Amino acid sequence: MASNNNCAYELIEAEAQSWDYILSYLRPSCIKCAIQLGIPDILHKNADPIMSLSDLIAALPNLNPSKTTFIPILMRVLVDFGLFNYHQQQGDGYSLTTVGRLLVENHHFGNRSFFLFAQHPVVLNTAASVGDWLKDDLRTAFETADGKSHWDYCGADPEFNGVFNDAMAGDSRLMSNLLISDCCAGVFEGLTSLVDIGGGTGAVAMAIAGAFPSLKCIVLDLPHVIADRKGSGNLEFVAGSMFDKIPHANAILLKWILHNWDDEDCVKLLKKCKESISSRENGGKVIIIDMIMEDNYNNKQLVQSQHLMDLIMRITYASKERTEKEWEKLFLEAGFSGYKIITSLGLRSLIEIYP
């Protein structure tokens, strides 16, 4: 009898978990709806940290009056997700949580633009095509879904390219604040020149150039990314391919670049970097910001995010996230003499490698 009861409890638990998977598609849809309505921004700009439901509804632009009764239903779900706090004693009021603040437009540490990129139909189409991709002979699920590689698609579709660049710029704003903070103290000290490879719109390089006025910063990226961007002072933009020619500098920055490429291309790029930097005695180094895969983190959510990022890289770019041993192998194959993991930046780490 006890055994039957245990089986019943396990079945009930399993069913609850399966319903969580079944309904999980609604999570990003509800968050996207909140962003489209401007709810995080409205709560952020409100004079009082707690905003009543009636005031929130009144502040929503273009809301059909017949749909106002849906807003508390939406907010209840978003409270469940941890984006907002609910204050019943303050007249059904709401406030932003730390996670919710990350969805405020132009927030220094926000990931709003990255979220919107992840919800773009082209990206969702890739995820929906994994089953078909496993049966065909194409290199990535992105090609299965959209007929060309991610990079070729960016070059051919200005709208998608803009959404992608906005996502990278948003992430760069977050990373640039970390790079010039105490947690990365000393990384740029003593350098006279730096090339930010694949630096996009230049958010990271701008922050570094501003924090270190005597450091010349060069952003190297493809012509359709650089477009008509102009540098000033100690900041310069150069259009070109990192696999062709890299401007000479003390140091090179590779932020979230190497995980886009397979081992062979990574070694090729790292060799190019080694040719373009000063000797170790003269401060030469390559600064890498990328993920180090570990399964022994105490943070289960962090491990799960790393596993999902690894899956994304494989289906989108035919690349992968790497363990420390896999990183070390790449560095040695490219001819570098050593490396040092400087600090952890949440999901990613900062690594210095030396010629």
Swiss-Prot record:
Enzyme class label: transferase
PROSITE patterns in alphabetical order: SAM_OMT_II
pH dependence as annotated: Optimum pH is 8 with myricetin as substrate (in the presence of S-adenosylmethionine).
Binding positions for S-adenosyl-L-methionine per the UniProt entry: 221
Single GO term (MF): kaempferol 4'-O-methyltransferase activity
Catalytic activity as recorded in UniProt: quercetin + S-adenosyl-L-methionine = rhamnetin + S-adenosyl-L-homocysteine + H(+); kaempferol + S-adenosyl-L-methionine = kaempferide + S-adenosyl-L-homocysteine + H(+); myricetin + S-adenosyl-L-methionine = 7-O-methylmyricetin + S-adenosyl-L-homocysteine + H(+); kaempferide + S-adenosyl-L-methionine = 7,4'-O-dimethylkaempferol + S-adenosyl-L-homocysteine + H(+)
Pathway annotation: Flavonoid metabolism
UniProt keywords, alphabetically: Methyltransferase, S-adenosyl-L-methionine, Transferase
Catalytic residues of the enzyme: 259 (proton acceptor)
Expression sites by tissue: Mainly expressed in leaves secreting glandular trichomes types 1 and 4 and, to a lesser extent, in storage trichomes type 6.
GO biological process, one term: methylation
Enzyme Commission numbers on file: 2.1.1.-, 2.1.1.82, 2.1.1.155
Domain of life: Eukaryota
Record's subunit section: Homodimer.
Family to which the UniProt record says this protein belongs: Belongs to the class I-like SAM-binding methyltransferase superfamily. Cation-independent O-methyltransferase family.
Function: Flavonoid 7/4'-O-methyltransferase involved in the biosynthesis of polymethoxylated flavonoids natural products such as myricetin derivatives, aroma compounds possessing antioxidant properties and exhibiting pharmacological activities such as anti-carcinogen, anti-viral, anti-thrombotic, anti-diabetic, anti-atherosclerotic, and anti-inflammatory effects. Catalyzes S-adenosylmethionine-dependent regioselective 7/4'-O-methylation of flavonoids; active on various hydroxylated flavonoid substrates, including myricetin, quercetin and kaempferol.
PANTHER family given in the database record: O-METHYLTRANSFERASE
Protein name: Myricetin 7/4'-O-methyltransferase 2
Source organism (scientific name): Solanum habrochaites (Wild tomato)
Lineage: Eukaryota, Viridiplantae, Streptophyta, Embryophyta, Tracheophyta
